[in-house]
Amino acid sequence: MTMPSPRTITASWLVVLAGLAVALAGCDAVLGSKSDPTTEEIFDQGQTDPTLVDDVGYVPLNPFYTQGFGGAFVRPVDVYVGYDEFVYVADDRGVHVLDLAGRPQFLLSEVAGQPLRDITAIVQDRRLDLYVAARRDTTVAGADCPSGGNPEACDLAVVYRISGLTTGTPRVADILWHPFDDGSRRFTRFETPDTYAGGTSDEDAEFTGVAVLADNRLYVTRRGPVNSTATGRPSQAFSPFNAFLQYTAEGEFVQYIRALTPDRPSLLSAYYPSDVLTFVGPPQRGSVALNEDFMIALAPPATQPDPTYGVVSVQVVETSDGTEYRVDSGRLGAAGNPDAGDGALFEAGQFVRPTSLAYAADQTGYLFVLDAGKDSLFVFNQNGIEGVAPPPGAGSTRPVRASFGGSGAGPLQFADPQGVAYYQEVVYVADTGNNRISRFRLNTDFE
């Protein structure tokens, strides 16, 4: 089925964007710019909390971002710093765009005539296209959607690809729909949204994570209740709602990965995924090695069994027999080596409800796991050992634990955090319950 693919965003919004760009350029011309690295370092040092102890750890950069375009943030659920060096924040009002100083530039609140709503994830690819996982209404002949009075009126999960935000000429380049862009259901009777055993339907599926590769191919995670015969999955050819999906850079469906089990947790599973992470990120580089490995956060609903490991790390290996998806034995093995550090990514029961993952695309290679169940941010080195590098001159090379958090509104606390990002030594957290974007930096990164 070919669904309509809207291509434009309202002209009035473009006028506002153009006006803002001129105004901001004028301010820099009259007042000068404070974006040079030396000045930023001085400001960062002056904005840290002086009462914190002088140990290795993350310190807050004040003030936190609380204002989006046209008003305060309302339950921000994700944050991403793009290749264009803008900060993207998704909340109940849409996607806000801020500069690196936290100054709001504009708000994308409507896409092709509908509100931009129920956002779950945002990310930018190397072409500067922005992906937004959200929901959209549509009418489908022959559908059975139970959310409203008309079964042909459906509320479905989508992933928007929006081009031209950086140049001031935004347009919707593509929309990935569930279930229309799931290749396992094309040209079958399951292509149309339907209702399944127990009253669940395609309206219960949601896209939870979006990640890009260096060549702009796309990984998407999806979750929902239809995953086995017992829960209404009609055949093995029909991809489960809990799935890891692959798309080309142009949005063509490639496959869903059958090697990742959908209905039981394991080291190779897509069991109620909440996010997906690849090992590429800003800033822009002339050449980037193509690494297809990925990590998935697992966060089942309270009615389902908890996974032993809340995060899985998967290696993609090309063999003479084709592509294989293997458990990341290196990071898994780190958990069995207590001499390597005081904690590891693969520790049983470590995470309660991991909601977001981030990767430091620099020489550190740090991995960040945001756990809304513990209101905490966990930090690991690239080998999967909990902690960060010790400061120069330290008597030991063991990573130093730097994870932090706790429930509350304090500078090192969170309330149901949903998104984490990293850019140039700064960690950004979408602190949902506190309606803010918190920022942190390692105290050893201040020169």
Enumerate the predicted regions with their spans.
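Beta-rich, blade/repeat-based domains predominating
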Residues: G71-G82, G113-D125, P193-L213, P262-L290, ...
